[in-house]
């Protein structure tokens, strides 16, 4: 039988057979397109409440011999009953802790990810480093040409130059020799379990975020170019807009959306 345990900085924090190390919640949330999370709660009399230091402590969840989660606490809090709760993010978030300098790259897709990880690993401590694992995402020509004139965190750089253009998913594997980062076109683990409402599906919740809805927008193009007194072409701060082709208005709007929620 595989026993689920939780460790904080190598110290046992939860074991189902030790009543003094009881917890009230350990809920993992997997996100294929983002960073996995863990919600951990423990009662006021847990002996190691003070051992979890947000952004510093390493929280590891094991099932049998396998590590199923590793990460850090982002925040902590307590409720009316003094139950303490921590929200944790997985080790993939370590890629937010390093900066990629401006770069220009020509070569293979694998080579760019190797470059990103090399820069990251040189900038962070041992526990935040990754080895490059399996790459099943491909480019038709096996040749890419990317550059960036700005600094960006490593995770954003990977998403911008690889995931957003070539697709795929990042997956962290926890091995005896360290963390391995895979870049996969599709996940290589398939569940044979069926989903049955009332049996293993107890609740369904749908949330729609309307804060990003736009009823009207102002399209702007490139900056206009003008000629100065010396007949040199210079770039002005004025942008090309749609006024000349939109009845004198520089905006467009969704009539149905405006009627529903206003401007």
What is each PLM-predicted segment?
Residues 12-17, 66-68, 227-229:
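Surface-exposed loop/edge segments in extracytoplasmic proteins
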Residues 189-263:
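Acidic, small/polar-enriched beta strand-loop surface segments
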Residues 1-51, 89-93, 256-263:
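Juxtamembrane "anchor/assembly" segments of surface/extracellular structural proteins
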Residues 2-11, 59, 181-183, 217:
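Short polybasic amphipathic segments
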Residues 110-114, 155, 159, 216-217, ...:
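Extracytoplasmic/secreted envelope proteins and their assembly/folding machinery
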Residues 47-133:
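Surface-exposed cap/loop segments at beta↔alpha junctions
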Residues 27, 37, 117-148:
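N-terminal export/assembly leaders
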Residues 68, 72-95, 133-214, 218:
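Short beta-strand-centered interaction patches in the first periplasmic/extracellular domains
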């Amino acid at each position: 039988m595989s026993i689920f345990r939780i460790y904080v900085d190598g110290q046992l924090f939860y074991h189902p057979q030790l009543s003094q190390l009881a917890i009230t919640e350990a809920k993992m949330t997997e996100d294929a397109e983002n960073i996995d999370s863990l919600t951990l709660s423990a009662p006021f009399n847990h002996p190691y409440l003070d051992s979890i230091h947000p952004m510093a402590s390493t929280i590891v969840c094991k099932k049998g011999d396998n590590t199923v989660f590793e990460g850090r606490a982002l925040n902590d809090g307590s409720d009316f009953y003094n139950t303490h709760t921590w929200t944790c993010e997985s080790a993939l978030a370590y890629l937010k802790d390093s900066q990629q300098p401006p770069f220009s790259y020509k070569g293979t897709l694998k080579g760019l990810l190797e470059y990103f990880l090399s820069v990251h690993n040189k900038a962070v401590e041992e526990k935040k480093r990754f080895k490059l694992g399996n790459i099943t995402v491909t480019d038709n020509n096996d040749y890419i040409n990317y550059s960036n004139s700005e600094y960006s965190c490593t995770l954003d750089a990977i998403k911008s130059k690889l995931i957003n253009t070539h697709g795929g998913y990042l997956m962290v594997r926890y091995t005896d020799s360290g963390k391995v980062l895979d870049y996969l076109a599709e996940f290589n683990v398939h569940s044979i379990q069926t989903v049955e409402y009332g049996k293993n599906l107890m609740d369904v919740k749908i949330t729609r975020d309307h804060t990003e809805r736009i009823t009207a927008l102002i399209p702007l193009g490139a900056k206009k170019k003008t000629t100065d007194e010396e007949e040199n072409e210079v770039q002005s701060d004025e942008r090309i807009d749609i006024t000349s082709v939109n009845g004198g208005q520089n905006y467009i709007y969704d009539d149905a959306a405006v009627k529903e929620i206003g401007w």
